[in-house]
Amino acid sequence: MKVTSAIANKMIKKYQQEIDMLDSVIRQNAVFDAAINEKIEDARPDFDFEKTYNEIRNLEEKIVELKHHLNVFNTKTEIEIDCKKFTIDKLLVYVAQLNKNLFKIGSYVECPVKKRLANNGNLIEYRHINFSHDFVKNEHERLSELVNEILVKLDTVNNTVEFEIPDNLS
C-alpha cells in the first residue's frame, strides 16, 4: 500500500485515538461493583480484558511499524534548499534551529539604536546597541524567508510523495 507521510501521520493519530478509547474502556470495566444481595454475574459488565488488551498491543505494533516506515522515508528522501540537498530528517532539525535563531534575532530587530535610561541626579544615561541594525533586519528577513521556503517544500513532499507500507498496517 502506498501512502504519503501526511496520510501515515493521520493513521498514527487515528490508531493512538483508538488506543486511548480502549484504555478508557479498560479503566471503566476492569473492576465493577456489586451489591451484597446481587448476583455477581448479573452485575459483571460485558467485557473481555484480554481481548481489549491485545487490541491495544496490535494498534501499538502498527504505530511502531508506521513510524519506522516514516522514519526510513524521512532519512532517504531529499529536498533541495539553497542548492544543497537535505534529507527530511536533517531538514526538520535544521528548521528547528532556524526558528530558534529567528526568535533570537527577532528580539533585536525593534531594539532602538539609542535609548534614554532613567535620570540619576544630573547625569543622563543612554543604552546603545552594539551590533549592526541593518545586519539584524536583513538576517531576520533572510531567516524568515528560508523557514517559509522549507515549510512549503516539506508540506509539498508530505502531501505528494508516496512510500510503501505493508497492507496489514491499514
Residue ranges and their predicted role:
Residues 1-170:
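Structural preference for solvent-exposed beta-strand-turn elements
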